[in-house]
From Swiss-Prot:
The keyword Transcription belongs to this UniProt entry's keyword annotation: yes
Enzyme's top EC category: transferase
Protein function: DNA-dependent RNA polymerase catalyzes the transcription of DNA into RNA using the four ribonucleoside triphosphates as substrates.
Disulfide-bond pairs as recorded: none
Record's protein name: DNA-directed RNA polymerase subunit beta
An individual GO BP term: DNA-templated transcription
InterPro entries found in the cross-reference section: DNA-dir_RNA_pol_bsu_ext_1_sf, DNA-dir_RNA_pol_bsu_external_1, DNA-dir_RNA_pol_su2, DNA-dir_RNAP_su2_dom, DNA-dir_RNAP_su2_hyb_sf, RNA_pol_bsu_bac, RNA_pol_bsu_CS, RNA_pol_bsu_protrusion
Catalysed reaction, written as an equation: RNA(n) + a ribonucleoside 5'-triphosphate = RNA(n+1) + diphosphate
Amino acid sequence: MAQQTFTGRKRVRKFFGHIREVAEMPNLIEVQKASYDQFLMVAEPPGGRDDEGLQAVFRSVFPISDFSNASMLEFVRYEFEPPKYDVDECRQRGMTYAAPLKVTLRLIVFDIDEETGARSVKDIKEQDVYMGDIPLMTMNGTFVVNGTERVIVSQMHRSPGVFFDHDKGKTHSSGKLLFAARVIPYRGSWLDIEFDAKDIVFARIDRRRKIPVTSLMFALGLDGEEILSTFYKKILYKRIKEGWRVPFDANRFRGYSTVNDLIDADTGKVVLEAGKKLTVRAARQLQEKGLKALRLSDEELVGNYLAEDLVNPKTGEIYAEAGEEITEKSLKALNEEGYKELPLLDIDHVNIGPYIRNTLSADKNMTREDALFDIYRVMRPGEPPTLDSAQNMFQSLFFDSERYDLSAVGRVKMNMRLDLDAPDTHRTLRKEDILAVIKTLVGLRDGKGEIDDIDHLGNRRVRSVGELMENQYRIGLLRMERAIKERMSSVDIDTVMPQDLINAKPAAAAVREFFGSSQLSQFMDQTNPLSEITHKRRLSALGPGGLTRERAGFEVRDVHPTHYGRICPIETPEGPNIGLINSLATFARVNKYGFVETPYRKVKEGRVTDEVVYLSAMEEGRYAVAQANISLDAKGRFTDDLIVCRAGGTRDVVLIPADQVDYMDVSPKQLVSVAAALIPFLENDDANRALMGSNMQRQAVPLVRAEAPFVGTGMEGVVARDSGAAIAARRTGVIDQIDATRIVIRATEDLDPTKSGVDIYRLMKYQRSNQSTCINQRPLVKVGDSVAKGDIIADGPSTDLGELALGRNVLVAFMPWNGYNFEDSILLSERIVKEDVFTSIHIEEFEVMARDTKLGPEEITRDIPNVSEEALKNLDEAGIVYIGAEVRAGDILVGKITPKGESPMTPEEKLLRAIFGEKASDVRDTSLRVPPGVQGTIVEVRVFNRHGVDKDERALAIEREEIERLAKDRDDEQAILDRNVYGRLADLLDNRQGVSGPKGFKKDTKITRAVLEEYPKSQWWLFAAPNDKLMAEIEAMRKQYDESKKGLEQRFLDKVEKLQRGDELPPGVMKMVKVFVAVKRKIQPGDKMAGRHGNKGVVSKIVPIEDMPFLEDGTHADIVLNPLGVPSRMNVGQILETHLGWACAGMGKKIGQTIDAYYQRQDLKPLRETLKKIYGDDETIKSLNDGELIELGRNLSHGVPIATPVFDGAKEADIEEMLKLAGFDASGQSTVYDGRTGDEFDRKVTVGYIYMLKLHHLVDDKIHARSIGPYSLVTQQPLGGKAQFGGQRFGEMEVWALEAYGAAYTLQEMLTVKSDDVAGRTKVYEAIVRGDDTFEAGIPESFNVLVKEMRSLGLNVDLHNSKLGVPPPAEAAE
C-alpha cells in the first residue's frame, strides 16, 4: 500500500478491501498530457520524429509547388524556442503561455527545358521561418490562454469506417426494414448506399440527391455484365428433350416451393411432389443421396434472368441482353433460334434477391460517361459538365489523398468489417472497397450477417487535445498554402527567400480561434481539485463534428454494455446533456487509434495471473471476462466450477466453466469514474442519487480547515496527488529551508552534475481560482525531514495530509426537529459557525483601466472631486487601496478621474484657471468601488503600466518587493550550491598530499579540513594534489559550479528585466490595476449543503448549541437531518457511512485516552496494543519509532480514518464489529435528549459522523435587493437579475393574485410608479423626501412603446384626455 510515504506514516487508513490490486492506476490526467506531447513531440530530436502530430501536418501540406512547377517549397524540420513568459507570469499578466514555433523551409528553384519539359535544380535556399506561437500545456494538463486556465475536453465521435444499419421500419408504412450502408472518412465526402421501399439500391454522396448504385459502379469502370457477374453466380441450363437440365445445389434449392413435381434429370424419378416446400434438411438429404441435376419444364424457367448477352454469332444481332427477364414469349423465340444452353443468374427470390439486377434495369445511365455526368450534376447542380471535369471531380471525391482520408483507424475498421487486407497506409477508397460494401449490404437484405451497433464503443472513438489541435493547425496551414502558391507565382522567385513567401497569420489565427472560441475549449472548473481532474477526464459527444443536444436520441445517451471499465455509467450531468457528456473510468486509457481501453488480468487454464492486458471494446468482444470479486484460492485458481462472466458480442452475463474464462477485471472500481469512486458504499446507493453525489462533490467549496473523511474509499490520496493540488517532491532529499511561501529541498538522489542539486518549490498563497475559490498551499514538512520522490510535502486547497478533503466530518442525528428539516432542509448547530467548521474564503478580482480618451487621459489618483477624506482613508498616495484594508460595499478601491467634455470658457475664466490651476470642475469621478454584497480584506494589488509610462510609487514598491523575493531565492540557491560544492570539494581534498596551494601554503603539506578552514572557500580551488584523475574531477566540478552560478545570475537578471519592462496592455490603455478582495463566508441559512450520496439540502436554521439534541455524555449533535430523506431516495450508503463514522470517532477517542495516559506514565505499550486491535498486524505501524507513533496517535485521536473501496468495502458484519470495538451498541443507535427540555426522546436515534460538503451555491451570491437602479432604455422598466442590479419581476400570475384580492391600489402602484411610469416614479421619490405619502399614477412608458409599434405598422393612434360625454375635438374627428 501507499502508506509508507511521508504523509502515510502520519495518518494510516484502515483498509477494508479484500481484493489485491494488481494494476497500477494510470495517472489521472494522462489522457491530456500524453495526447498533447504526441502532437508537439518537443522531446524528440527534429530529425527523428515519427510521422504524426505536428510533423504529419507539415508533411501533408508541404511540399508546395507554384502553378507552373518552376519552384517548390519543402518542409525540413521544426523546433520550439523557449516561451517568453513562464506559467505564473502569464497568469498574472493575462498572457497566453505559448512557445514560438520555428520551421526550417527549403525553397528549390528549377530550370525548365522548354523543349523536353525536363526540370533541373537551379537554386536551393534554406531558412528558418517563424510560424506563430503554439500554446503549451502546463504540468497539470491545462492551457493558460489570456491569463485564464482552460481545458480542452476530449470529444467522442463516430469512428471512420463503414457502418451498416436499417431504419427500424420507420420510413415505410408497411414497417419494412430498409437497409443502408455509410462509409465515413476522417475527412472527405460521405458515401451512403441504401435500399428504397421497392428494393432498388441507391447511392448518395454527401447526403445529396440519390443516384442508382449501378451508376456509381459504371463510374468506377464496370459495365452491365461485369456488375451482374460481380454480384451473382451464373448457372448453365441445358436443353434436354423433356425440358431443361439444371445442376442441383442444396443451398440454392432450400425453401423452394414446387408448382410441378421435381424430377431427377438423370433417372426421371419424382423427388418431390408438386405443391410442397423443399426444407433445408430435405434438400441436404437429396444431395447426400447423390442427386446431381433436376429436370425443369419451360414454364419453370420463366421469371429467371439472363446472365449474359445472347448474340447471333453470324450477324452480331443481340437477341437478349444480360439481366433481361425470361418471359414465355422470349423463351419461345430463343427455342426457335435453337439455343441449347442458357446462362441464367442465380436469383431464387428466397436466398438471393434480384436487387442489383432490378437497379440495373431501372438505371437510365448505360455508359460510364452518362454516369459521370449524372454524378457531376448531383454534386454541382447548374454547372455544365465536360467529360474531363466530371472525371476529375469523381476522382477527387474518394480517390485523392488531398481531399479524402479514411485515416489509419478507418482503414483498420473497414478491413475488419469487410474482410479485406489493404495496408493501413492506404487511406483512400478503392474500387474493391466500394463493391465489398455493396455486396455486404445486399447480403444483409438477403438475411446474411448483422447490422452494426453505432453506440458500441468499437464504433466510437475519442479525439483528444493533440488530435483536435492537429486538425485545427492543418486548416490554418491549408489557408496559408493558397496564399503561398499565389505569391510564388507573382514574385521574382530567384531573389526571394522562404521568409518572404510565408505569412504565418492564418495558422496562428486558427490556433487562437480554437483555444479562444471552440466549443471544446472550456474555462476550467477549478472549484476544487476533484472538479479540475474530472474536467480534464471528460468526454463530450457535442462540439464541432459531433452531435447536437436537440438531435441526440435516447440510444446515444444510454449506457451501453461496452462502457464497462471504459466510461462511467454514473457520472453524467442531469438535464439536456445527460449521457452526451461522460467521464472516463478510473483505469481506462485511450489507445493510439483513439479507442478507449480497459485493463484485465489474463487467466491461463483457470488460474488468474498478474499479467495485465489492456483491451479495447472490439477486442474484448471475443473473450469471456470474469468480475474482480470472484473468489480465488491462494494459488489464484477459481474456487467455483462455474463462473459469472460477460461474454459474446452482446456482453451478456452468463455462467461458464472456469477453464473457459479468458480474463478477469483488475479492480472492482474500474467501471466507475474518479468522482464516483470517492463515494463510500456506492453499492448501497440508488444510481440516480449516486449521479447527484458524484456531480455535487465537484461543487464543494474548499474550506478554511480541510479535514479528510473518516470514511473514505482509498482514492483520496490519488486524486490529491494527480490533480496537482498537493505538491509532491520531485527528487528524494532533505528539507533545507522552509517558510509559508516556499520549500527548499537539497536533493540526495538523482544528482546530475549538470543540474542544480537544489529544488525550490514555490507555494501558492491566497490565489484566486477560476471560480473565485481560494487556492492556498501550506507546507507539511519541517527542516531536516527526509522525503522520498513522490512524497507529498505541501497541502493545497481541499487536501489534508495529502488526501482529498472536500468537506468536514460532523456529528449527525437523523430525526425530525420542529419542522426545521422538512423537505430536505438542514438544521445546524451554532458551534459549526462559531468554530468556522464550514467557513470558506472566496477571492474576488476587480480591475480598473485608465484609458487615453479623446478628451485627454484618465488618471489614477487620490485627488477625486467631491469625495470626503473619510472615503479616501484606505488609499495610498497613488490612489490605490492598501493591502490588508477592510472594505465594504461602496468603498473606493482605486481612485480614478475621467475628463469631462469642455464647456466653452470666457477669457476671465481662462485667466483664473491659469492663475489658480483650478481643474476639479472638468473631471468626473469614475473610481472603482466595491460592488454591493461584497465585504472583505484586500489581499493583493497588481499594477500594470504601459511601455514608456512613468510608474507611480505603488507600482515601484510592488516591483521592489518582487525583486527582493527573487534575490532571496537566488541567494538561497547560491548558498545551498556553495555548501554542496564546497562540501564535495573538501571531501575530495581531505587527507591528500598538497603539491601547491594558495598564498601561504607550504608545498607538500597534507591537506586536512583544519588547513582548509584557514583559507576563504573561494581559494580552495587553488589547492592541487599529485593525482591527475582527482584534479580532472575537481576541474570538471569547478566548471560546472561556475556555469551554475552564471545560470542563476542570468535567470535572476532575466526575471528582473521582465519586471522592469512595461506590460503589454490592450490598445488605448495606459495603466491597469487589479485588486483582489478576500471574502470570508461563514455558513448561514440559505446555503446549500450535501453529503456524498446525493443527499442535498439547504440550511434552514442555525440553533444555539444548548438547544441541539445531545447524547448521554453531553455531546451535542452538529447537524440534524430528516430520516424521511432516506427511504424514498434509496441512498442507504449515508446511513452505513454514519454508523462507520461513529465507530471511527469512538476508536479515535480511545486512542486519545491512551495518549493522555502516556503523558502521565511515559509508557507506549498500551498505545501499540490499542493500534494493534484496530489495524491488526500493519507493517507501517510496526515500523514507526516512538516519536512517529505519538504523532500518529495524535492525528488519529479525532477519528480513525478507514477506506472502504467501492464494490469491495466493509460489510454489515464489519461495521458491527467496528462499533463493538469502539464500545458502542451494534445497532448504531443511541439515546438522545432534547436540548431545550432535557427530556429523553421517545426512541433511540441513529447518531454518527457523516461527511458533509458546503456547495458553491451560496446565499450571498444569490440574494439581492434593489430600491433605485438601472432601467431598460426602450420600455423604461427596471432591468432584471442580480448582475444588472435589477428589480423583482411582477409577472402575470402575481397580477392575478392581486386582482383576486381586489387590491386595486397596490396593483396600480406595481404597474405604474414602481415600474415604468417615468414621471410618476420621480414624483413619488420627491413626495417621500417631503414626508408626504400621496401620489398620482401617470401613463406607463409601455403604452407609448405600444403606440409607436402600431404607428410603425401604419396605424395612427392618438391619446385624448377628454371627460366622458364630452365630444372629442374637431381635428380628431376628421
